[in-house]
UniProtKB/Swiss-Prot annotation:
UniProt entry tagged with the keyword Hydrolase: no
Keyword tRNA-binding among UniProt keywords: no
Catalytic activity as recorded in UniProt: alpha-D-glucosamine 1-phosphate = D-glucosamine 6-phosphate
Protein known as: Phosphoglucosamine mutase 2
NCBIfam families: glmM, PRK10887.1
Natural source organism: Shewanella sp. (strain MR-4)
Gene name in the database record: glmM2
Modification Phosphoserine occurs at: 101
Required cofactor(s): Mg(2+)
Short name of one Pfam family: PGM_PMM_III
Length: 450
């Protein structure tokens, strides 16, 4: 059974347009509270990023949870992985994040974590959706008796607790003293956390894009827009730069030369560091979008590699199925189950810094030990029609077959719909950059006219 409201990363959309409305958020809070907090502490944590709409949706969710008899603990602007961690340590029944991650401020979303700090599975989301449908279609939101309504409280030391957790994933015998690091918080949820983590571990920190005003989150900054970080690293002659996205669940690096180090390269650096110390447990989980160069580099160390569906939730599922600990996506979602239950940009960055210090090499040198294959990704925005019907059209299928014949065994093609936006993503990868670009554009055009 397919999910109606939950995409690959919760519920997401444009603020003021269904389903990202106050009414929907209230009913979702009621349905989720009824399902997730039917036993246990009957309390949920709510965190958010810095979007102006977060206040509105937070209040609506509070009302829904209270109507279901569930208490709410507010932790304010907080990275998504912090909510996952704190939901577990506070013994809450669930954690709620109000964020649209790397999207612009006019989008927002709602996602849930279990009391173990993991994202909900498909069955749990379907159960919530079934109850939500009743509340939407039949106005069946049943408020508990007045004496059983949920209460709301604010937790003031949440940021400090999370900072200490992050620092605890970094070895005590190492220090960042002597490193100059530029940190780009994307005017997002980590603006008051990430710079302090690195400073408290000894680094000289230049903090940029750390002044959220409700509408500047991810605005030409952060992990999806690295130009300002690249410039800052060069201007300040820093050792490296670290970019987070709006909710700090993904991370990208810039080396001292101003060159980007993406999620695939981060996975390689972490896997190689573990391999060289004899600490590599199992293999690495990537996704269908992971660069073939990563797979080949890992193969050179006899490290197994498997591809999950795109989305960090599916990477986690594959990690648990295999019993492995390291996985992630090229976009910077890095999963290290040894340290955290979900993708954590700050924690992942600390593991990269550990690898840099222990190797005695610069980040650029570690990056250079993996050769990426040219990969072209074209996002085709849909103005009409649904992604599934377009992908099933013969003209699109024939374009893919033709491209695969041209590439032969020196490349691969992948088409997939976005789980969060009206897009079809066309990815082509091969050893020849001009051929890769040509075939990607050919397929993208077929999708546009389909």
């Amino acid at each position: 059974m397919s999910r109606k409201y939950f995409g690959t990363d919760g519920v997401r959309g444009k603020v003021g347009t269904f389903p990202i409305t106050p009414d929907f958020a209230m009913r979702l809070g009621w349905a989720a509270g009824t399902v997730l907090a039917s036993t246990g502490t009957k309390e949920v944590l709510i965190g958010k990023d810095t979007r102006i709409s977060g206040y509105m949706l937070e209040s609506a969710m509070e009302a829904g949870f209270s109507a279901a008899g569930v208490n709410v603990a507010l932790i304010g602007p907080m990275p998504t992985p912090a909510v996952a961690y704190l939901a577990s340590t506070f013994r809450a029944d669930a954690g709620v994040v109000i964020s649209a991650s790397h999207n612009p401020f006019y989008d927002n979303g709602i996602k849930f974590f279990s009391n173990t700090g993991t994202k909900l599975n498909d069955a749990q989301e379907l159960e919530i959706e079934a109850l939500l449908e009743q509340a939407l279609e039949h106005n069946a939101l049943q408020c508990v008796a007045s004496e059983k309504l949920g209460k709301v409280r604010r937790i003031d030391d949440a940021a400090g607790r999370y900072i200490e957790f992050c620092k605890g994933t970094f070895p005590n015998h190492l220090s960042l003293a002597g490193l100059k690091i530029v940190v780009d918080s994307a005017h997002g949820a980590a603006y008051h956390i990430a710079p302090n983590v690195y400073r408290e571990l000894g680094a000289e920190v230049i903090s940029i894009n750390d002044k959220p005003n409700g509408v500047n989150i991810n605005d030409h900054c952060g992990a999806t827009h690295l130009d300002s970080l690249q410039s800052a690293v060069m201007i300040h002659e820093a050792d490296l730069g670290i970019a987070l996205d709006g909710d700090a669940d993904r991370v990208m690096f810039v080396d001292h030369n101003g060159h980007v180090v993406d999620g695939d390269e981060i996975l390689f650096i972490l896997a190689q560091a573990a391999y060289q110390k004899g600490e590599m447990q199992g293999g690495v989980v990537g996704t269908l979008m992971s660069n073939l160069g990563l797979e080949l580099a890992l193969k050179g160390m006899d490290i197994p590699f498997v591809r999950a569906k795109v989305g960090d939730r599916y990477v986690v599922e594959q990690l648990k199925e295999t019993g492995w600990q390291l996985g992630g996506e090229g976009s910077g979602h890095i999963l290290s189950l040894k340290h955290a239950s979900t993708g954590d940009g700050i924690v992942a960055s600390l593991q990269v810094l550990k690898a840099v210090l222990e190797s005695g090499k610069r980040l650029a040198e570690l990056k250079a030990e993996m050769t990426k294959l040219p990969q072209v990704l074209i996002n085709v925005r849909l103005t009409s029609g649904c992604a599934d019907s377009i992908l099933s059209k013969d003209s699109v299928k024939q374009a893919v077959i033709a491209a695969e014949e041209v590439l032969g065994n020196q490349g691969r093609v992948l088409l997939r719909k976005s789980g969060t936006e009206p897009l079809i993503r066309v990815m082509v990868e091969s050893t020849d950059i001009s051929l890769t670009q040509q075939q990607a554009e050919y397929i993208a055009q077929a999708v546009k006219v389909a």
